[in-house]
Amino acid sequence: MRLPWLAGCAIIAMLPLLWLPVLPGPCSLAGASALALALIRLHGRAVAGVAMTLLLVVWGVLSAHQALWPTRHLTGAIRQAEVILSETDGQTLHRGQMVRLRGRYLFPPVGVTLYGELAPAPACAGQHWLMTLRLRPVHGQLNDGGFDSQRYALAQHRPLSGGIVAASALDARCSLRARYLASLTRRLQTYPWRAVMLGLGMGERLSLPTEIKVLMQNTGTSHLMAISGLHIALAASLIMLLLRGVQYILPGRWIGWRLPLLAGLAGAVGYAWLTGMQPPALRTCLGLAVCCALRLSGQRWTAWQVWLCCLGAILVADPLAVLSQSLWLSAFAVAGLIFWFQWLPLPAGRWRWPWKTIIALVHLQAGVTLLLLPLQLLLFHGISLTSMAANLLAVPLVTLLAVPLILTAMLVHLSGPEIVESLLWLAADRVLAVLFWGLRRLPDGWLTLDARWLWISILPWLLVMGWRFQSWRHSPALCLSVLFLLTRPFSRQPPADEWRVTMLDVGQGLAMVIERHGKALLYDTGPAWPQGDSGQQVIIPWLRWHHLQLQGIMLSHEHQDHRGGLDSVLQAWPQAWVRSPLGWAHHLPCHRGERWQWQGLNFQALWPLPGSTAKGNNHSCVVRIDDGRSSILLTGDIERQAEQAMISRYWRHLTSTLIQVPHHGSNTSSSALLIRRVDGAAALASASRYNAWRMPSYKVVQRYRQRGYRWFATPQQGQITVVFSAEGWQIHSLRDQVLPRWYHQWFGAPADNG
């Protein structure tokens, strides 16, 4: 079987890891292996391809099982382990590899994210520690269109997180890279663009100012800060050119193309190690190694064959790389460029320099901009209208000037002379100053788009193919049909009698969306934390991705886990009204007796009492929403005292189809009397898995179930959506119904929420 065919089999074999709801067990894997071995005995390329694909499927599934093994066997108790740090902020956040557990070596080492202080030695990468750890499986929030942290953690081979109970340094020496980075950081203290230089040269993005990150995102130039193919290939090219230059003064018998090629590969690996050998850099090195091997084979390979072999080798070496968004961005970008230059090549012309170079750059950047639209929209929910202009400025400055200057300065930093190093750093700093001066002159070009645009985003690919085949001449009806299908989401309207309530997965907090006819209301806005809030991270992106116009906010009470995202949401939709029991300026009242209508739905406030001056959980705004057939009771954080007072005054109006479980399922709420008076069919609870209060309480869950309620909670189900219509109502949970993936599962102990 030829190598490209084998690579194609590998890619096909690993793709199921993206969609499998559960991983096949030992019996299924043994059966697949036996079938593959039986097929190998038969003749024919197709049969051999099926057999090899089956064997590689088994390999991929075994790798996934191995990645999940720590979540089943290393959690649930305090463990003593030896950890080698690979990354640290020097304070309370550390990433590393567990290499020994209770005296036994772990192979492969288990990646872990740790929280806590390491004393007395200051933490740095490369240190070897003996730690007492409280480990737990990775668990992330899951919302439609949101960041998938569980998938990301498994792609990075970090299935565990934990707290440091105790630690002692076995070897406090920092790694060579950490020492070199510290030396470089001290050397660059006086340069204004030192953070960007460290990012471009060493892959250190943590120190980048937020303003620079936002600017690069809005201009579509963030990819330049990732240490991956561009920088590593550039480092390899510099080494190759240097060695080719040296060969000019050597005897003829010592001149050859193999030595510079291998030296370039060695230089790429060395540079990737220097930048921390992150997974994208490691994949780039593997791809370069495959390219070198194909070049050394003496055969001619097409661009598509090289692409297949590189991607196949990466997935065989690391099957979980199939979960990595960065891998697919890189692979899609390279495939798009091959497609662009083969299907829409730049016409041969008589342009002279510099116009020839400028036109070639515009052609290249146009291909990248247009053909990457589907992935960019899917991953980032928007496009940069200024990305083409920004990259026409940034790519030449960074690749031809800034990065070569930085790499050369990093080499000179090892040996001197200091004056040469200073000149190189100064030149790189000035190049970056010019770059960001230009980027800041561009208008804010970031355009947020919703899910309807996903189909339209593949139009550039179809237009290029249609132009080459002249489809508009031969099959105009087909072209019009395809265009109609791509634009169909824009004309599709939800049923007039349908409305939805979605409980977003915001961790230990509450945020619910009521939507109808393309409009939306919020009940609470989730928690906030020092670096951000749920409004920025979850609510605003979710509403925009689903093409919803926010018209109002109901705020249950003043606690931070319920109003944390309020300011961010109001900044995005300043015209939205706010209704709460707090009596704050510009807030509409939410007290017992208040009634209003919105989009044909009836809203009735049941608590707190008018004129009440109480604060806290028992002052929560309780609202009942109904459409005449079905209803839902939103309770905020009321506790038993408020429940009993509300029932004594308003018990006839509490009956509802569903209830939002009060106070995240705390044992101080959800009294048996409330559950009986509501007499609902389902209960929805919002909490985080690892909350300090172990909510929802086991007793509360049993209380609801004993009364016949179906129980749904965001730690288990992720985002929960209830669809109400004339036919009744349905509940769709994201984790186990809409997106049931093996990497979305609840790992570890079934009842562990603490």
Question: Which residues does each predicted region cover?
Answer:
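Membrane-interface helix/helix-cap signal primarily in integral membrane proteins
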Residues: 54-223, 533, 537-541, 545-549, ...
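Cap/insert and terminal regions of metallo-dependent hydrolase folds
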Residues: 643-718
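Metallo-beta-lactamase
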Residues: 550-561, 659-663
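Membrane-interface helix caps and helix-loop-helix hairpins in membrane proteins
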Residues: 272-281, 296-300, 317-327, 374-377, ...
